[in-house]
Amino acid sequence: MFQGSIVAIVTPFKNGAVDEEKLRELVEFQIENGTDAIVPCGTTGESSTLSYVEHDRVIQVVVEQVNKRVPVIAGTGSNSTHEAIEITQHAKELGADGALLVTPYYNKPSQEGLFRHYKAVADAVALPQILYNVPGRTGVNLLPETVARLSVHQNIVAIKEATGSLQQASEVLALCGDKIDVLSGDDFITLPIMAAGGKGVISVTANIMPKEVSSLVDAFNAGNLEEARRLHLYLLKISNAMFIESNPVPVKAAVSLMGKCSSEVRLPLAPLMEANLAKLTAIMKEYKLI
């Protein structure tokens, strides 16, 4: 259902507030350059530091600006199941086409707890939902066997696999078959995951190079493996640079260097350190992005 090059879009700020004008411009930049779907309020969108009102407003602005040209998949995860249900329902009411739900963080649920959490949200809200597994941030790993149990639910349509492990992604693919789609959650392994049967990527790099990320996915789907491999290797350095510090600090700096919005992030995130900003600037010049 949700396939291809999907951007986890940044949330631009200006003087501490959401910069709606720049957000709309970023949406246009994505659509003009071939992005297949947009995820507002994900990790890259700094969802954890948005108020409930801001969270709803960011989704609303993106839905309005997209105007049904591509799917909008709202980040609606929480470490409270009740809250995740409420946020997902709000996203549906605002016109989102789907929801991306990160595994509950900090409280470290068991696999049974994770299963019950996701099932409860999927039972409560009739909206296509993507599981989001990123144990490096959440402290819990949604194991392939649990994904397989969830894959039979009609409202669970995909998983964003951000373990960085090709083995785990492959195990999910082997256990789930075509019941759900597997999307790479790490730009640097998009091509290997697609080669194993994945359907695309939820990308950080697409914030600055949407055309190239989209072209990689399209080349693979067209059977042009040589071009897909070329783009995979070409994007590797810039994709790694997006994690020179904690996401989304580097990508916010990169988008700012391109003149598209402020690099402002919210505490407890801090601006990119000067030494890393110099490294990022040099890499972006190599790619002729600035």
UniProtKB/Swiss-Prot annotation:
Gene: dapA
Domain of life according to the entry: Bacteria
Organism: Geobacter sp. (strain M21)
Active site annotation, chain numbering: 132, 160
Subcellular location: Cytoplasm
Entry function: Catalyzes the condensation of (S)-aspartate-beta-semialdehyde [(S)-ASA] and pyruvate to 4-hydroxy-tetrahydrodipicolinate (HTPA).
Catalytic activity as recorded in UniProt: L-aspartate 4-semialdehyde + pyruvate = (2S,4S)-4-hydroxy-2,3,4,5-tetrahydrodipicolinate + H2O + H(+)
Swiss-Prot/TrEMBL site (Part of a proton relay during catalysis) positions: 43, 106
Keyword match Disulfide bond: no
Stated name of the protein: 4-hydroxy-tetrahydrodipicolinate synthase
Alphabetical list of InterPro entries matching this protein: Aldolase_TIM, DapA, DapA-like, Schiff_base-form_aldolases_AS, Schiff_base-form_aldolases_CS
Top-level class of the enzyme under EC nomenclature: lyase
